[in-house]
Amino acid sequence: MKFSPALQSATLILRYKRFLADVVTPAGEHLTLHCPNTGAMTGCATPGDTVWYSTSENLKRKYAHTWEITETQQGAFICVNTQRANQLVKEAIATHTIPELTGYGSIKGEVKYGEEGSRIDFMLQADDRPECYIEVKSVTLADRDNGYFPDAVTLRGQKHLRELMSVAATGKRAVLLFAVLHSAIERFSPARHIDPKYAQLLNEAQKQGVEILAYKAELSADNMTLKSTLPVVL
């Protein structure tokens, strides 16, 4: 996924009200960016970090600029725009980058399913195999080279795990794919210290046939590509 037009850089002053961030450009201009991330963004929003942002041509938008990537003062790249995770996964499926998800002729997004009124991120279909339901989660929380999800208690994430277990029980494929969007992360685990219920459900889901994958993106200010699988440590 190549950013076009190219992203612009600025220095982070402050993220606030979850959806807003104040930055200053190299030319000294102060801007307010839209922050497309509802999470805690721990370690992703330290004042002084470099922010890479895109600019919309939609004149109706209140905030024309969107925070896409953080380049930390330690040199790590982190994609904070959670919408990019699904785009990366869709691209990776289409280019056969994820071996576990090859062999399907049809890919559909945002399909209604489950008993709790959910929408699955992707559903893959083929004539010769069961349907494959894929839920995507974005991973940006890091402690050294360990990556964790979630970065805050997530009742929605717990619901998705229950829905995936129900899918697996019918004989269809249920896949939970963690898109790791932090360049320093080398392995993935559930954030038991933040949301123990989610960690418990993730273990239960694996035992009940839900496939758990973690794939890491190669990140820069120019482009992003889902590249390599990472070990999952439950």
From Swiss-Prot:
GO terms for molecular function: DNA binding. It holds the Pfam family SfsA. Belongs to the SfsA family. This is Sugar fermentation stimulation protein homolog. It comes from Enterobacter sp. (strain 638). The lineage of its organism: Bacteria, Pseudomonadati, Pseudomonadota, Gammaproteobacteria, Enterobacterales. The gene is sfsA.
